[in-house]
Amino acid sequence: MLDALTFDAGSTLTPDYMLMLDSRDITGNISDRLMSMTLTDSRGFEADQLDIELNDADGQVGLPVRGAVLTVYIGWKGFALVCKGKFTVDEVEHRGAPDVVTIRARSADFRGTLNSRREGSWHDTTLGAIVEAIASRNRLEASVAPSLAGIKIPHIDQSQESDAKFLTRLAERNGGEVSVKMGKLLFLKAGQGVTASGKKIPQVTITRSDGDRHHFAIADRGAYTGVTAKWLHTKDPKPQKQKVKLKRKKKEKHLRALEHPKAKPVTQKKAPKVPEAREGEYMAGEADNVFALTTVYATKAQAMRAAQAKWDKLQRGVAEFSISLATGRADIYTETPVKVSGFKRVIDEQDWTITKVTHFLNNSGFTTSLELEVRLYDVEYETEDDE
C-alpha cells in the first residue's frame, strides 16, 4: 500500500507547495490567487510541463516574462516538500471573463539550442561520446546508461536535424530513452526500472484502495509477431545475402500474465556460426505478421539493435494500465517499477513501469494520476541464421 505518508488517524491532509521565480520565493504572492497547478512528468523528449492558473478578477496579476525560470516544490503540510525541478516559462495566456492567467513552463527550453537544426557527422565514436558532446553544447550534464554508453557508432550524419530529434533517433535505434530532467540530459534503457547510472529504482506497491479510478486495456499481441531490419555494408565484396531471426534466450518467461491461454512453447535451436554477409535482413520475433523497419542500416549489429529496440517497444505496449491516486504522491517519478493488487488477476500478476505522472493540486486537494506499461526485464537474445 501507499505508505510513504503516515499521519495520525482523524487528521486532515492539506496540500502544500512552494514556487520560486528566478530564486525568489513568490508563494505568498500567489497563494490567494492559485486556482490550480498541474505538473506532468513525462518519459522521453516530451518535456515535463508545469501549468499554473491564477485568478485575475481584479486585474492585478503581472504577466511573467517568457524565459523566466520557475522552481516548484509540492507535497503536504507537515511533510517535507519534494522538488520537482526547474521549468522555463514559454507560454502565457490571459482569458476572461472571469479573468484568468495561465502560465505554462517546461523542463527544457525548446525555444533554445536543443530545437535548432544542425549539420554534422560522427565517425568512429561511441553512443556515450555523442550524447556527452550534445549535452555539452546545450549546457547540460550528460548521464548515459553504462549498457548504452559503449555502443560503437562507425558513422552517422545529423543533416538539418535538431539535437532533440537526432537524440530521439539514436535512442530508437539503440533501445534507449532520452529526456531532459533538472539540467541533465538522460539517456537510459526504457522500462528497466533503473536510473541512467544503473542504480535500481525502488519498487512501489499500489492497492486498489489507493485509487479512485483505474483503466486497463490489453491488445492482441499477435497484431505484430516480429520486427525485421535490413543492413548493407561493404566489408565483404561478395554479394552474399543473409537473413537472421531474433529469439529470446530461454529463461524466466516474460509477459506471463498476458500470455494467450492457447499459446504453445517454441523449441529453441542453436545458431550456427557463419561469416557476416554484406547484405541481409534481421528479424526479431516470429515471421507470421512482421513490422518492417524502413531504414537500411550500415552493419548487422546496428540492424540487430534497431530490431530488438522496436520489438521490445511493441512488447511493452501489449497492455496499458492507468490509475488516479486519491492521495497525491510527489515522490513518484517515471520509470518507477510498480506492483499492484486488488484488481483482476491479469493486472495483479504483471509487473509495471510508470511512463507518465500527472500531479494536480489546488487549495482543496492534491491527486496523482499514473500511466503504466508492461515491464520488461533485462532480456537476452540469440540468433538463428536462415541461408
Residue ranges and their predicted role:
Residues L2-F7, V100-D109, P146-R221:
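Short beta-strand-centered interaction patches in the first periplasmic/extracellular domains
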Residues K86-R95, G120, Q192-V194, D351-N363:
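Short, compositionally biased
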Residues F110-R118, I130-D157:
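N-terminal export/assembly leaders
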Residues I74-W76, K189, G342:
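Conserved "cap/hinge" positions at secondary-structure junctions
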Residues R33, M37-V65, G211-E387:
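An acidic/polar, Gly/Ser/Thr-rich interaction patch typically located in mid-to-C-terminal regions
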Residues M1-G112:
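Assembly/oligomerization scaffold segments
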Residues T125-S136, Q160-E172, Y224, T228-L232:
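Polar, S/T/G-rich
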Residues R95-P98, T126-S143, A298-R305:
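Glycine-rich, acidic and aromatic/proline-enriched surface loops and short helix-turn segments
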